[in-house]
Structures are given as structure tokens and as C-alpha cells.
């Protein structure tokens, strides 16, 4: 198997050709149910019912789980859809055609078990199906958008978020919390120095002294250990959508892909995106020193993604039938002799004879 490669074809068909345990992480955003027509046969999201849509994606992610290393994770972005009256559901403002979600394509808007105007609950239908299929459902991350697309509805709040589900192949998996840690609030250090007295909720995390006040340990009010300046990343991520002029309806924000990759894919590892679209996951992987495997059904998007990867954030595109695109050499057994997927992060730093901070962080990332 070769890394740094885009396969142009059906996701399930291509995935079946990939070897077991060959990628470290999957970051992807499949086409949402009944929201877009991407103009190619065999596209996902045009199924007659949500149940068929979920069934189709479950079979694809079953193959994703097979090709993941035992400590691999899946970062799955998905949004919901509303049931309609038999012709279509609710739509966004048609004046804004390049949003992450958009005008609903008319299928059969009636959904079994749902009334007209009901929120279908597609993200959770899919999440529960994946859990039942063997995935560990670890987190429901809310992607909050300060610049959401306008909606024409007047009888409910406008949507400003999507889901990112973190799922793992095994109970123990790679997650680099340090790589995505976020700054604590400015008021936190001062409150910690004041201690656990009336009106304060902070106490020192010192073995054997569960309720010891922080300000009891040093005269200046600091604890014996340094007051942390970073905290574990929360599960609400504020990331704005960014218009992409390359002709793809639903470009993934670079920052969103970056966060998932830093947390879920070790340096030198391989990330998979079976719904590559305009190539955001692959482009970010290359920038961060990771390898990528991309799969995309639409030949035009295959070419667009390759141009974007090679030119950074290049917006030009040459629309032509695409075969298989590749960059550089492969992973194992190739002329450049890259380590096998899943081994790169384990072997980093070996032979140097020292316990470096980088190595310690890598070890800590394995839960």
C-alpha cells in the first residue's frame, strides 16, 4: 500500500483493497442525508430513507475499522436533516449556495416515524448504529460556527453547529491531549491562588490531601506545583466556516481537520479520508507531517483535491477525468522505506539513548 495517494472511486470498493491495520486515524465528513446532489452515480446521501443511508455508512465504516491500527480513531463530522411534507424538507437561504449544509434536494421528504418538520436525528442514528457495530463511541464534539449559513425558517432557532463524533477501534487508543490543550481562562490562576475557601471551587490535586487548599502550600498562595496554564480541550469547538473558491459545496475548515489530526494521528502516521471532497484532510496532513490516503467518488473533485494538496491552498482546478493520483513513495516495502503505518510514532526517537519530552508526550498520548 502506498501513502500520499488519492483513489478515485467508490469508498467501499476501494477500502476493501486496503490491508488490515494500515492507517492510524480517519478524519472525514460524508455527504449529509438528502442535502446535496453531487452529480455522480452511486453517491451517498441520496438514499430513499435515513435507515438506508445509515446502513450504507455503517458498512463503509466497518471497513474503516478494519484498516485502522488497534489504537486508531475515527473523527466523523455529520449534520442533521429535517423531514418534509413529501417533496422536500427545510432548506437554507438559496442566496448562499456554498455552505456546509444547503438546500435540501427533493427526495421523498416523508420519513417513517417522523412528522413533517421533525428533526430526523441522523447524527445520532448513525452514531448508535456504529456503536452497535463494534465502535467505541467516545465523544460527541459540537462544532459551533459563529458564521452559520442563514436559514429561511421563522419558527425555530437557526442552526449553528454540527456534530463531530470521536469513535475508537479499541478501548485503549491514541489520543494526544497535550497537542490540542487550550489556554485556561484568564481568571483561573487567580482563583486557584485564592484556594478552596468560601466561594472558590479549586483545591490542590495532591495525593493523600484531597481537600487541601491550594493557598496552604506556599506563602505566596501558589501550590507546590505550578498552576497550569493549559487545560484539556473541551468538547465545544468554535471554528468558523471558510469559503472555498475551488467549486466544492462543503469545504472542511482547515482548523477543524488540524485539531482532529493533532489529537488523533501520531507524527509520521497515516490518516484516511474516504470522502475526501476538496482534499482538506490530505492537505492538512501533509502540512503537519502526516501521510494521507484519500478516496473520492467524483473525478472532478479528485483532480481538485490533488491540485489543492500540491499547491497548498491553490484555488485553480483542471476538471478532467481522474484515475489514481499519488505523491512520493509508499509506506512499507517501497524504495524510500517508510515505516509501516502504526509504527512511525513508536519508533520515533529510538536509538537516541535519551528520554526526551517528545517521547514522553507520545507515551502519554496512549490511553
Question: Where are the predicted features?
Answer:
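Core catalytic lobe of class I
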Residues: 1-312, 320, 331-355, 359-367
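Juxtamembrane/interface motifs at transmembrane-helix termini
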Residues: 323-325
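Acidic, PIN/NYN-like endoribonuclease modules and their adjacent C-terminal/linker elements
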Residues: 328
Amino acid at each position: 500500500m502506498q501513502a500520499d495517494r488519492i483513489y478515485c472511486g467508490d469508498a467501499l470498493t476501494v477500502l476493501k483493497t486496503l490491508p488490515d491495520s494500515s492507517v492510524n486515524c480517519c478524519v472525514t465528513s460524508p455527504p449529509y442525508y438528502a442535502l446535496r446532489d453531487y452529480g455522480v452515480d452511486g453517491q451517498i446521501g441520496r438514499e430513499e430513507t435515513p435507515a438506508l443511508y445509515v446502513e450504507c455508512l455503517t458498512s463503509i465504516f466497518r471497513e474503516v475499522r478494519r484498516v485502522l491500527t488497534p489504537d486508531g480513531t475515527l473523527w466523523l463530522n455529520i449534520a442533521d436533516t429535517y423531514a418534509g411534507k413529501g417533496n422536500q424538507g427545510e432548506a437554507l437561504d438559496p442566496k448562499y449556495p456554498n455552505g456546509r449544509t444547503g438546500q435540501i434536494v427533493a427526495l421523498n421528504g416523508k420519513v417513517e416515524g417522523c412528522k413533517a418538520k421533525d428533526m430526523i436525528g441522523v447524527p445520532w442514528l448513525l452514531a448508535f448504529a456504529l456503536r452497535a457495530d463494534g465502535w467505541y463511541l467516545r465523544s460527541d464534539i459540537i462544532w459551533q460556527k459563529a458564521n452559520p449559513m442563514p436559514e429561511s425558517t421563522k419558527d425555530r432557532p437557526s442552526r449553528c453547529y454540527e456534530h463531530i463524533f470521536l469513535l475508537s477501534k479499541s478501548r485503549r487508543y491514541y489520543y494526544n491531549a497535550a497537542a490540542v490543550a487550550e489556554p485556561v481562562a484568564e481568571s483561573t490562576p487567580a482563583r486557584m491562588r485564592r484556594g478552596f475557601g468560601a466561594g472558590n471551587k479549586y483545591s490542590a490535586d495532591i495525593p493523600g490531601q484531597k481537600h487541601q487548599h491550594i493557598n496552604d502550600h506556599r506563602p505566596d498562595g501558589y501550590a507546590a506545583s505550578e498552576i497550569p496554564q493549559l487545560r484539556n480541550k473541551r468538547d465545544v469547538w468554535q471554528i468558523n466556516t471558510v469559503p472555498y473558491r475551488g467549486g466544492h459545496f462543503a469545504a472542511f475548515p482547515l482548523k477543524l481537520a488540524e485539531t482532529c489530526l493533532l489529537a488523533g494521528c501520531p507524527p509520521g502516521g497515516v490518516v484516511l479520508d474516504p470522502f475526501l471532497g476538496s482534499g482538506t484532510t490530505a492537505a492538512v496532513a501533509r502540512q503537519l507531517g502526516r501521510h494521507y490516503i484519500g478516496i473520492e467518488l467524483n473525478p472532478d473533485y479528485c483532480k481538485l483535491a490533488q491540485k489543492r494538496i500540491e499547491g497548498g491552498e491553490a484555488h485553480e482546478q483542471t476538471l478532467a477525468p481522474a484515475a489514481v493520483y499519488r505523491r512520493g513513495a509508499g509506506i512499507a516495502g517501497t524504495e524510500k522505506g517508510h515505516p509501516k503505518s502504526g509504527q512511525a510514532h513508536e519508533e520515533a526517537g529510538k536509538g537516541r539513548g535519551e528520554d526526551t519530552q517528545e517521547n514522553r508526550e507520545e507515551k502519554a498520548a496512549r490511553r
